[in-house]
Amino acid sequence: MITQKLKKYNFSACSFFDRPNSLKGGFIIRFKLSSPVTEREVTEIFSVPDAVRGTVRLLTLKEAGEGWGWNENYTSYPDENGFVPVLECEIYLNVPYHPERTAMKIGVPLTLYDANDKDMYLLYDGMHLCLFSDGLLINENFPIGEIKNSSDAPEVKIGGKTESIAFSHDLSAVTTSDYERKLDKGIRYYSPAGHCTWAGDVVNFWYDGVYHLIYFFDRHHHGNRFGGGAHFFQQLTTTDFVNWTDHGPIFVLEKPWQSVGTGTMFHWRDKYYFAYGFHTSRNIPDEHLYGRDIYEQYRENGYTKAVSYDEIYNAGKYPNGANLAVSDDGIHFKMMDKMFHWEENPSVYSFDNESLMMCIGNGIWNADSPLGEWKLTNPGFPPCGERSSMRNSSECPSFFSKNGYNYIIMGLTGFWRTEKDGETYIDCAAEGHDIYDGLLVPMAVNVSVKPTCQ
């Protein structure tokens, strides 16, 4: 059994009008189609020039697998005649540093969602572009930049296939309530709620009888925010490996530049921590990022130390690299808004509340506290790229111990082990031991119960 903890959205308190004001500050569009989609050509249902456009179209399976249709996984949802009716909404943006990025799209196959008898809602708030049906979020992308159209009274075009349409700027009037959905199925092949949802870069953690499975929530096959991913982590927990709860996001993205990189969860002195990276360089040029400043701090002092986001912003730059979130219960996390290293995929582990280790490509670092001084204690290990015998990548090292042996596995092929109760690592991959099938993010953890997976 899987329990999904979701949010239901209510738009009834929003004031809707036939025409919008300026769309730059955000908007909600409520609309309904007048008839099923049977036309092969693109049919416009609404548009505001240089701002937003909604269309419907009947696609062949070949067309459904091309372009953005591939990102939306349309080919999985044909109708009884082998065609895919789709609804697509697009916004038009001015994106800083990237003038070539002008349009952002989301869509859904109408074989899954009824846009004729039920209202659909499109929401844009500067940070999110969302589609809702039956009060549930069904698709989402993450804009950066601003809507191109700056008019206070923009022109609106309504298509002939539109049963009803209305506009609102009452973003703050949208309310949410908790909602649980039960799935009578095992965890294998699990996908999160919503359209075109995927789980990737899985991280695991075991503490106090609870197994935490933390996964990248991905839509559109890494296609969100112009291919930058705009990823965040969600969390599943279980105590018996039969019944699972998907708690939703560990934390939500708050800024348009944020895209989370893989990390690890650890427990330290009565608090849970999640170490993660920010892949800010996917949207912001390197010269505007603080990673180089952190590196220069290390070269000057021999260690890195946490720097607050306020200090980074005051320097005219953006955070990237390694960051931390903290929690009292291991479920609800709050970002600490401090950057402590330039690494974008930090793997941090705690040892008896006394010391911390961060394992990254070409280096092991240690500190006495999460926001303390991080010092490089084992330069060059674990090796990656041309320095490694099996040419493993630098992504997402995983450290674990078993029966007196310490292990590190890392991107694609990396595999090292100490002797029993020893400290020196042996390159087991170079000896021909291939323990996993080329996983880019291999993760392992000890558990104190025997799993009975379903």
Describe the role of every protein-language-model region.
Residues 35:
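Residues on the solvent-exposed faces and adjacent turns
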